[in-house]
Design a protein with these regions (language model features):
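A hydrophobic/aromatic-rich effector-binding and dimerization subdomain
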Residues: 2-33, 80-149, 167-176
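Regular secondary-structure segments
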Residues: 55, 138-149, 194, 198-201, ...
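Generic protein-terminus/edge-of-domain signal
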Residues: 1-75, 82, 90, 111-118, ...
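Short, Lys/Arg-enriched, Trp-marked, Pro/Gly-tolerant hinge/linker segments that flank
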Residues: 122-134, 148-161, 167-199, 203, ...
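Acidic-residue sensor for enzyme active/binding pockets
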Residues: 50, 147, 243
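Basic/polar phosphate-binding segments, predominantly the helix-turn-helix DNA-binding elements
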Residues: 196-200, 204-242, 250, 254, ...
Length: 298
């Protein structure tokens, strides 16, 4: 494959087409209006970063184990494989921008501003952009959107430029943290349950035990949890355990079986099947690919 690419002249139509395809695969910007009737079928996650900017209206977003209420001017930063779901409220339709991009863009940004600089941007998932600066953020999303539709070899350069301007703005925009809007009672109960699961996922949790922590019957809790999160109790617990396992695969020398047991799975075979279903590769393949990528980035 590499030899074939070497034979393409840099100024040839084939090279331009290849560059354009790569940009489309690496970076996508979407602007959409969402009515109350729109709803994600269930929470999802993806192997790339996402910046979500709410232009108008309001919505409710569940991320990992926390519920956020968003209003116009709020921006949310999502890292790869963060579970999330958006629900839109009553009233006027909401309008939002999303920018999705592969980790290589973030890795390059971090190499220029330090890991601490990057961490400060993603340390709090939601940021309220001051009203007088919302048009600036909107314009950056518009410019990125235009570049994803461009067919020349400069698109990637421009995309990096606009994205890095946006990330720099977000990093500098972080002043004293403002308290989040208080959750309504039902959402507060579900968030408490999700956070309990997140904290205790390595233990042999049961639906009955978690329902007891929020003072609900198992049947009622199961219905409320699924309605609010979009996943059943067992599905959500498995997702949390798999994300912990993925981190341990890349950061420890524990065996696959040891990791499975550490994260709360009853046996290695079930863990392997669940991991492959979620990630598309086995735990061992994931560990190997992660280590190879780390070596390539040195």
């Amino acid at each position: 494959m590499k030899e074939k690419n070497k034979m393409i002249k840099k100024d040839s139509p084939a090279a331009s087409e290849a560059a354009c395809r790569n940009v489309v695969n690496e970076f996508m910007v979407e602007r959409a209006r969402r009515a109350q009737s729109f709803a994600m079928e269930k929470p999802h996650y993806h192997p790339y970063y996402e910046l979500y900017f709410l232009i108008s209206g309001s919505c409710r977003m569940f991320i990992d184990h926390t519920i956020y209420y968003l209003s116009a001017g709020d921006i949310v930063m999502l890292a790869p494989y963060q579970l999330h779901q958006t629900l839109y409220g009553s009233g006027q339709p909401a309008e939002r921008f999303t920018a999705n991009f592969v980790p290589v863009y973030i890795e390059y940004f971090a190499s220029q501003c330090s890991e601490d600089g990057l961490a400060s941007i993603f340390s709090k998932r939601k940021l309220s952009v001051p009203k007088e600066q919302q048009n600036y953020v909107k314009e950056l999303f518009l410019q990125m959107s235009k570049e994803t539709l461009s067919s020349d070899c400069y698109s990637r350069i421009q995309l990096k430029s606009f994205l890095f301007q946006l990330l720099t703005f977000l990093g500098r925009c972080r002043g004293p943290e403002q308290p989040d809007q208080a959750l309504d009672p039902d959402d507060a109960v579900i968030q408490n349950a999700a956070q309990y699961i997140y904290t205790h996922h390595s233990e042999p949790l049961t639906l009955e035990a978690v329902a007891k922590t929020v003072h609900m019957s198992p049947a009622w809790f199961s219905r409320k949890f699924h309605r609010a999160v979009g996943l059943g109790f067992k599905e959500y617990l498995t997702h949390v355990r798999l994300e912990d396992a993925a981190e341990l695969l890349l950061t420890t020398s524990l065996s696959v079986t040891e990791i499975a047991l550490t994260c709360g799975f009853s046996n290695g075979n079930y863990f392997g099947d669940a991991f492959k279903k979620a990630r598309g590769i086995s735990p061992r393949e994931f560990r190997f690919s992660g280590h190879v990528q780390a070596e390539d980035n040195r």
